[in-house]
A protein has these predicted regions:
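Short active-site oxyanion
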Residues: 57-61, 130-131
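Active-site metal-binding loops of divalent metal-dependent hydrolases
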Residues: 5-7, 44, 104-105, 135-137, ...
Length: 287
């Protein structure tokens, strides 16, 4: 199973000048993974739904929120390989394998469109184990309702990165991600949506360190597996703070936030025309 796989271009198209991955981050390829049976998509933003990756997985089964299927059909994924879900829709895929799309506090949009497709989170129940995948979401009491319906969870995979007070309703702070895991009654929380793309002004390791510390404070177990590391459902998971042994890489604009405060409006005005043009061209390409 894959959740929101993005193995395509280095930049989040159609923003051809960024955001991009951290310099040393791209060290793996889709071809290095085993055969993928199922792909779960949470919403259609470019950093969660990548056209080239989807087309490379054209023999997999896709589970998507309402409206996201239209993108996949345009990209030549057969309709019989796509299942669409509304919030709290459930499906039994095979004996002992049940899934459900659950709400998230976010939005959708691709190209020049906005909110033309649904967004959500996923619950996966495999025999006696339950996994929650948040996708993108701000913090809300919906986590309590999800636990009431499907909990407790062995693992809650929750976004904890790319946060900022300007968009705190659609992305969680690390401390909120821990609270979400507590609300979900999760044995272990795995933080995601961090250390990949530069989408906010916090430091590279800030999400992981804050989640780790908040987990210790609240007695919520946190595991931060490295890429390629494996674990077995139902068995103890390590909480190794590996990022402390990695040299920090903070782009210059994360170190000069005062300058950024002056430059951002100018960059916005200079780039808005380019963004609109590139989004239009990208949408034409996808269509």
């Amino acid at each position: 199973m894959l959740f929101d796989p993005v193995f395509g271009s280095d930049n989040l198209n159609p923003l051809v000048f960024g955001p991009a991955p951290f310099d040393y981050e791209h060290t793996y390829q889709l071809s290095q993974l085993p055969e993928i049976d199922y792909v779960f998509i949470s919403h259609d933003h470019y950093d969660h739904l990548d056209m080239s990756t989807v087309q490379s997985l054209d023999e997999s089964m896709f589970f998507v929120p309402l409206g996201v299927d239209e993108h996949l059909k345009v990209w030549d994924i057969p309709s019989n390989q796509i299942m669409t879900f509304d919030w709290y829709d459930e499906a039994t895929i095979s004996e002992g394998f049940d899934i459900a799309l659950t709400p998230s506090q976010h939005f959708s949009g691709r190209g020049l469109t906005r909110d033309g497709a649904l967004w959500g989170s996923w619950v996966v129940q495999i025999e006696n184990h339950s996994i929650y995948f948040s996708g993108d979401s701000g913090y809300s009491k919906e986590f309590v309702e999800i636990n009431n319906r499907y909990g407790p969870f062995d693992i809650a995979i929750c976004e904890a990165g790319q946060y900022n007070e300007a968009w705190d309703q659609i992305h969680m702070y690390p401390e909120q991600a821990i609270q979400a895991a507590i609300d979900l009654n999760a044995t272990t929380m795995i933080p995601i949506h961090n250390t990949k793309y530069i989408l906010a002004l916090h430091e590279w390791d800030d999400p992981l360190e804050r989640v780790y510390q908040e987990g210790k404070r609240t007695n919520q177990h946190v595991s931060t597996p490295m890429i390629g590391e494996s674990f077995v459902l139902g068995e103890p998971m390590e909480d190794n703070p590996w990022w402390r042994e990695v040299a920090k890489h903070n782009p210059w604009f994360l170190k000069t936030s005062a300058i950024v405060g002056w430059l951002l409006p100018l960059l916005f005005l200079a780039g808005i025309g380019m963004i609109v043009h590139e989004r239009f061209m990208s949408q034409l390409e996808e269509e």
